[in-house]
Swiss-Prot record:
Its cofactor is [2Fe-2S] cluster; Mg(2+). GO terms for biological process: isoleucine biosynthetic process; L-valine biosynthetic process. Binds 1 [2Fe-2S] cluster per subunit. This cluster acts as a Lewis acid cofactor. One of its GO terms (cellular component) is cytosol. Its EC number is 4.2.1.9. It comes from the Bacteria. This is Dihydroxy-acid dehydratase. Functions in the biosynthesis of branched-chain amino acids. Catalyzes the dehydration of (2R,3R)-2,3-dihydroxy-3-methylpentanoate (2,3-dihydroxy-3-methylvalerate) into 2-oxo-3-methylpentanoate (2-oxo-3-methylvalerate) and of (2R)-2,3-dihydroxy-3-methylbutanoate (2,3-dihydroxyisovalerate) into 2-oxo-3-methylbutanoate (2-oxoisovalerate), the penultimate precursor to L-isoleucine and L-valine, respectively. Mg(2+) binds at D81, D123, K124, E492. The active site is at S518 (proton acceptor). HAMAP family: IlvD (MF_00012). The gene is ilvD. Pathway: Amino-acid biosynthesis; L-isoleucine biosynthesis; L-isoleucine from 2-oxobutanoate: step 3/4; Amino-acid biosynthesis; L-valine biosynthesis; L-valine from pyruvate: step 3/4. GO terms for molecular function: 2 iron, 2 sulfur cluster binding; dihydroxy-acid dehydratase activity; magnesium ion binding.
Length: 610
């Protein structure tokens, strides 16, 4: 029988001092034999997706202790990408993922915890904790804070009734809106606690946690404000004790993160991502999580899946007026997984923390096939329509569910939005190791696009050039030296893409970068160009006026410059060093320098190489 890890610090004469300290935390003799469950929280008042998590850790802890475990809570950091956006704060976002993973490892291993419940929500917190779970490989269950309700608005010139923070950004840069209208949009864009309401990075990752098998059904789509979400937290507390005892005392196999999140589970997660048009950031994170679990899942696998998995669901920012609350009404993630399964595009035999197999879970939770009142009730959980920062503050329910798979929010393969999926990997001489585009957000008219390079040596330059009218129709805005090393930190480019839309160039220009994009990005926005400029990538050799050819259907991107000219440019660049031609006013701290020194390319998930 595997010995509880916690016995290292709770048993033996030599641990008298440690037990004395444990007693000072409230433990008694009867606790020194129970599994110690780490409650890994991420509460912060800086982030709306985490502002409501303060008391939820202790709520889970009470369930853990009632089920026979000992609960010990600690907190990680959490960066709000939306607040950090558009200034040097964004340099810290991606590196914070590694800090989160490390901090979880440090706390869990230093105190010999046996298992953990991870309470995450926003962009880098869920992937950071998933990386830690794969690294530690102890029983773990993920339960996120949930999505916020969509903003509701009625402005004549705005072609939508549901909005989010991206709409506020676009409106603010669009001169057709008055200051009063912009303020009205701003005030209504983010009405409640929770992760931003569209299929941005946070919600994408929380949905993928379901597909990986490490989160409970409803984790990705049940609103933060709805009382039904409370049940997920309570169930996580009870179930973690159950699977911990089954692993350590019953010697049962298939309960650890690496046994659940196998190569096939990563294929399931990526297939879901492609089917729902998730954030391109998920590519980075899935690669990093797989790396931590020693799962050989690569960009090549993603490319293979992207060629056969259809787009079954379009959510903001890929379409207007459809948000996570609408996905939930249509049956949530298990309804998308069910459609993938029926299309032969899912590994049904993968395990989960809640069911013996993914197929068994689909049979119970997919509203199209399940005769399950519990599932029907869960997916009728509706928004409350009241501004609040309180979790579980309302119990509204839809009168009916969206089960229309021909024209509804979730489609069957036969009625897919496109038979080509929502994410694609492109390769070419400007991106030998690949780059990523969210095809679900690209208008069909520009899936094939040839344009003229407009080179910017930083995101700041790009923003200035777009807002001052220097970027013209037909341009490919190239933003370089913003990769993991070059930034450092691989900034998100939400402002440039939003400003292109506000200037009416969303369908007339492309954007190409070795940086990355917010989950709120749409349009012909191609990121993660690898190798990055700072590593000697060809993107560093592009000059103003060069022709760039983008062919998404054929997964190709090409810089139309001869090999001889590129060789001459490379020799000249190597002579002066791979750095921006125009000096940047950017203070790089010691922490960021350390990150830049160790990080790898986006094609490898921007993980550290040590």
């Amino acid at each position: 029988m595997p010995m509880y890890r916690s016995r290292t610090s709770t048993h033996g004469r030599n641990m008298a001092g440690a037990r004395g300290l444990w007693r000072a935390t409230g433990m008694t003799d009867g606790d020194f034999g129970k599994p110690i469950i780490a409650i890994v929280n991420s509460f912060t008042q800086f982030v709306p997706g985490h502002v409501h998590l303060k008391d939820l850790g202790q709520m889970v802890a009470r369930e853990v202790e009632a089920a026979g475990g000992v609960a010990k809570e600690f907190n990680t950091i959490a960066v709000d990408d939306g607040i950090a956006m558009g200034h040097d704060g964004m340099l810290y976002s991606l590196p914070s993922r590694e800090v989160i993973a490390d901090s979880v490892e440090y706390m869990v291993n230093a105190h010999c915890a046996d298992a953990m419940v991870c309470i995450s929500n926003c962009d880098k917190i869920t992937p950071g904790m998933l990386m830690a779970a794969m690294r530690l490989n102890i029983p773990a269950i993920f339960v996120s804070g949930g999505p916020m309700e969509a903003g509701k608005i009625d402005i004549a010139d705005l072609e939508m009734t549901k909005i989010d923070l991206v709409d506020a950004m676009v409106a603010a840069a669009n001169d057709k809106f008055t200051d009063e209208q912009v303020q009205h949009i701003e005030e209504n864009a983010c009405p409640t606690c929770g992760s931003c309401s569209g299929m941005f990075t946070a919600n994408s990752m929380n949905c993928l946690a379901e597909a990986l098998g490490l989160a409970l059904p409803g984790n990705g789509s049940t609103l933060a404000t709805h009382s039904d979400r409370k049940a997920l937290f309570l169930e996580a507390g009870r179930r973690i004790v159950e699977i911990t005892k089954r692993h350590y005392e019953g010697e049962e196999k298939g309960l650890l993160p690496r046994e659940i999140a196998t190569f096939e589970a990563f294929e399931n997660a990526m297939s879901l991502d492609i089917a729902m048009g998730g954030s391109t950031n998920t590519v980075l994170h899935l690669l990093a999580i797989a790396h931590e679990g020693e799962v050989d899942f690569t960009m090549t696998d993603m490319d293979r899946l992207s060629r056969k998995v259809p787009c079954l669901c379009k959510v903001a920012p890929n379409t207007a007026n459809v948000h996570m609350e609408d996905v939930h009404r249509a049956g949530g993630i298990f309804s998308i997984l069910g459609e993938l399964s029926r299309a032969g595009l899912l590994h049904d035999d993968c395990g989960t923390v809640h069911s013996a197999s993914m197929g068994e879970a689909i049979a119970k939770w997919d509203i199209k096939v399940a005769n399950n009142p519990e599932a029907e009730s869960l997916f009728k959980a509706a928004p409350g329509g009241v501004r609040t920062t309180q979790a579980f503050s309302q119990s509204n329910r839809y009168k009916d569910l969206d089960t229309d798979r021909e024209g509804g929010v979730i489609r069957s393969k036969e009625h897919a939005f496109s038979q080509d999926g929502g994410l694609a990997v492109l390769f070419g001489n400007i991106a030998e190791d690949g780059c990523i585009v969210k095809t679900a957000g690209v208008d069909a008219s520009i899936l094939q696009f040839t344009g003229t390079a407009h080179v910017c040596e930083s995101q700041d330059d790009a923003v200035n050039n777009i807002l001052t009218g220097k970027v013209k129709e037909g341009d490919v805005v190239v933003i370089r030296y913003e990769g993991p090393r070059g930034g450092p930190g691989m900034q998100e480019m939400l402002y440039p893409t939003s400003y292109l839309k506000s200037k009416g160039l969303g369908k007339a220009c492309a954007l190409l970068t070795d940086g990355r994009f917010s989950g709120g990005t749409s349009g012909l926005s191609i990121g993660h160009v690898s190798p990055e400029a700072a590593e000697g990538g060809t993107i560093g050799l592009v000059e103003d006026g060069d022709r760039i050819e983008i062919d998404i259907p054929n997964r190709r991107i090409h810089l139309a410059v001869s090999d001889e000219v590129l060789a001459a440019r490379r020799a000249a660049q190597e002579a002066k060093g791979w750095h921006p031609a125009k000096p940047r006013k950017r203070k790089v701290s010691t922490a960021l320098k350390a990150y830049a020194k160790l990080t790898t390319s986006a094609a490898k998930g921007a993980v550290r190489q040590v």
